Amino acid sequence: MLQQVPTRAFHVMAKPSGSDCNLNCDYCFYLEKQSLYREKPVTHMDDDTLEAYVRHYIAASEPQNEVAFTWQGGEPTLLGLAFYRRAVALQAKYGAGRKISNSFQTNGVLLDDEWCAFLAEHHFLVGLSLDGPPEIHNQYRVTKGGRPTHKLVMRALTLLQKHHVDYNVLVCVNRTSAQQPLQVYDFLCDAGVEFIQFIPVVERLADETTARDGLKLHAPGDIQGELTEWSVRPEEFGEFLVAIFDHWIKRDVGKIFVMNIEWAFANFVGAPGAVCHHQPTCGRSVIVEHNGDVYACDHYVYPQYRLGNMHQQTIAEMIDSPQQQAFGEDKFKQLPAQCRSCNVLKACWGGCPKHRFMLDASGKPGLNYLCAGYQRYFRHLPPYLKAMADLLAHGRPASDIMHAHLLVVSK
């Protein structure tokens, strides 16, 4: 009998709408993935594939563990509420009393009262894409017709709050917004947002090989390429995070939860929970496309990183395959010497392999493009992280660090 349960913890994120989206955000790396399925124009997950995903994912999970379903795109709301009602019903059918959770990333444009009532009823955690105030958000996040989307997203945010849906806000940090950290942060706080994640936008223009597949953006690899005009500069990303951290630690500890800070604290105290790109290895978070194809990672949806198909192979076969094992282990094995001797290695771990397309000081490939920014950020944090860890160890809340006699922000 084929092995059903993978050897170690894992996660499978679904993209039921494929790359289909109702927006045309300039910096999106996934819209163009439709080129990979040109021979099969249907890009929405059908009932058979949905059932296979739910059934196989639950079967592959240890009985004592929560089964965490994540729905992303493209834009997952394009499938309509009926699709997710069926997904929840299938989870109940195959879950047999298991603890099951759902999270959902959306641009928010199609959310209405009916959607939000459903999301609240079934305890979905919603990730809403919002880049900050209108002048920042609307620069790159536009409709197919090029119209701004900020008002539509703010309407969605209001609806999520009205229906008490658990949500966080996902903020893409681009070349423009990186220069306005407090404008972005304060706008979100003023809008009532409590959970925030900052995502650096880094993309390169396609080389000839990638362009032949109909793609405009560079595939991951160690070849340097021309950056897109919206890609954040490394030093500015570091300064962006430091500015927000300094602002947060003076007034918002225990009130606003910035995932980039949470991950840094987890690594500092040796706790689980840090994001994959700041772990020594990766490869345990795969994605399933609309037709059941499984890929090594959300950022590696390219033919050479396809692991198989949910209709033909078990999750265990694919995620424990030699190909995927090597993919995950290479995150550490291919670290250049400069990273291995770096004093923030255990905070950074080289970042996401997708961004390792620079040469290190000795001319060796594999240095993360964001290295300078990560160094700035991770070298700034330790005194504060230690102070918060000490407070917690003595039974005091981390928010006590905001008291004037404990807080000295470096200049």
Curated annotation (Swiss-Prot):
GO terms for molecular function: 4 iron, 4 sulfur cluster binding; metal ion binding; oxidoreductase activity. GO terms for biological process: protein maturation. Its cofactor is [4Fe-4S] cluster. Binds 3 [4Fe-4S] clusters. The first cluster is coordinated with 3 cysteines and an exchangeable S-adenosyl-L-methionine. It comes from the Bacteria. The active site is at residue 298. [4Fe-4S] cluster 2 binds at residues 276, 282, 297, 352. Residues 3-250 form the Radical SAM core domain. [4Fe-4S] cluster 1 binds at residues 21, 25, 28. The keyword Metal-binding applies. Gene3D superfamilies: Aldolase class I. Belongs to the radical SAM superfamily. Anaerobic sulfatase-maturating enzyme family. NCBIfam families: rSAM_more_4Fe4S, sulfatase_rSAM. This is Anaerobic sulfatase-maturating enzyme homolog AslB. The lineage of its organism: Bacteria, Pseudomonadati, Pseudomonadota, Gammaproteobacteria, Enterobacterales.
